[in-house]
Design a protein with these regions (language model features):
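N-terminal regions immediately upstream of nucleotidyltransferase
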Residues: 1-53, 71, 175-176
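Charged, amphipathic alpha-helical oligomerization/scaffolding segments
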Residues: 9-12, 37-44, 94, 101, ...
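Conserved structured core elements
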Residues: 11, 32, 36, 71, ...
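Alpha-helix N-cap/helix-initiation motif
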Residues: 27, 31, 84-88, 184
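Active-site phosphate/pyrophosphate-binding segments
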Residues: 27, 110-199, 203
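Conserved catalytic core of two-metal-ion nucleotidyltransferases
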Residues: 35-39, 43, 49, 89-138
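Active-site nucleotide-donor binding segment shared across nucleotidyl transfer reactions
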Residues: 39-89
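Single conserved hydrophobic/aromatic residue that forms the stacking wall/gate
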Residues: 201-212
């Protein structure tokens, strides 16, 4: 399948999904199916460009949760083995170029596991996204090592402290109020960011037990 065919298929799927959503208003179903449509497009592009199976292609953040909103960034991590080939790096660049053709903003990182750990240590947003990772294609063994390593490196008290500081700073931008003529339903108090923080906190009882 050529890139123009992949793009047309994806855009047609999005149109059908939008019409179905307006008829059914089932947000959970929409986000799940839209994420799967994005997966299909990504897989077709990976096949088109011939990316090596040595690389793990990972969905992160909302996309990793299979909650890909229609105009949200398509967030991907290209996870590299230690002995990555120059050819693979070139192919990744070609893949990223084709992904932009889908009409979505592509947020991406290209890292080895050690580099992921370094980034997680200095960037709470990146660390959060890494905790919501899902393998799309490629090196499953490398992905498992990455997931286990990220999980083991997680300092829960430090993580939640940083998340709540991040939340407080975000709330200050909106005067700590959810009331506005044009509320920001993603960033403002009580919005999607706060909902996601709550879901992260309650998602795994074992994590709660560790910090209680």
């Amino acid at each position: 399948m050529e890139i123009n065919e992949i793009v047309k298929k994806f855009k047609d799927q999005r149109e059908v999904l939008a019409k179905k959503f307006l008829a059914d208003v089932d947000a959970d179903a929409y986000l799940s199916v839209h994420s799967k449509a994005a997966d299909e497009a990504v897989l077709e592009i990976l096949k088109l460009n011939g990316l090596s199976e040595a690389v793990a292609v990972v969905a992160v953040g909302g996309y990793g949760r299979e909650q890909q909103f229609p105009f949200s960034d398509l967030d991907l991590l290209f996870l590299l083995p230690d002995d990555v080939k120059d050819k693979d790096l070139k192919t990744i660049s070609e893949v990223i170029g084709n992904l932009w053709s889908l009409g979505l903003t592509v947020g991406y990182s290209v890292r080895k596991i050690e580099e992921c750990l370094e980034q997680a240590d200095i960037d709470i947003t990146a660390q959060t996204a890494m905790l919501e990772s899902r393998l799309i294609s490629g090196n499953a063994e490398l992905f498992k090592t990455y997931s286990d390593t990220i999980e083991r490196s997680l300092n829960l008290k430090k993580f939640y402290r940083a998340k709540f500081i991040e939340q407080q700073q975000r709330h200050l931008k909106y005067h700590e109020s959810s009331y506005a003529l044009e509320p920001n339903i993603k960033e403002a108090p009580g919005g999607l960011r706060d909902l996601n923080l709550s879901l992260i906190h309650i998602s795994e009882p074992t994590r709660q037990a560790e910090i209680s």
